């Protein structure tokens, strides 16, 4: 099944630590995901780093 090879992660703002986005990616990736996304709390585009979703 393809769903077993994907995991859900959280993207959290690096400035205010607000958890804004959920993202699904493959389990075989060894690097931490880091994207520029819009943060509603900050009101601007900031870097969002990967964290674990419960």
UniProtKB/Swiss-Prot annotation:
GO cellular component: cytoplasm; ribonucleoprotein complex; ribosome
Entry annotated with the keyword Ribosomal protein: yes
Span of the signal peptide: none
GO MF term (any one): structural constituent of ribosome
A Gene Ontology BP annotation from the UniProt entry: translation
Pfam family, one: Ribosomal_L33
Keywords: Ribonucleoprotein, Ribosomal protein
HAMAP family linked to this entry: Ribosomal_bL33
Family statement drawn from the similarity comment of this UniProt entry: Belongs to the bacterial ribosomal protein bL33 family.
Protein name per Swiss-Prot or TrEMBL: Large ribosomal subunit protein bL33
Originating organism: Elusimicrobium minutum (strain Pei191)
Protein's gene: rpmG
């Amino acid at each position: 099944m393809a769903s077993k090879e994907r995991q859900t992660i959280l993207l959290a703002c690096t400035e205010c630590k607000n958890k804004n986005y959920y993202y699904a990616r493959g389990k075989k990736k060894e690097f931490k995901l880091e994207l520029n996304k819009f943060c509603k709390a900050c009101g601007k585009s900031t870097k969002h780093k990967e964290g674990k979703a419960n």
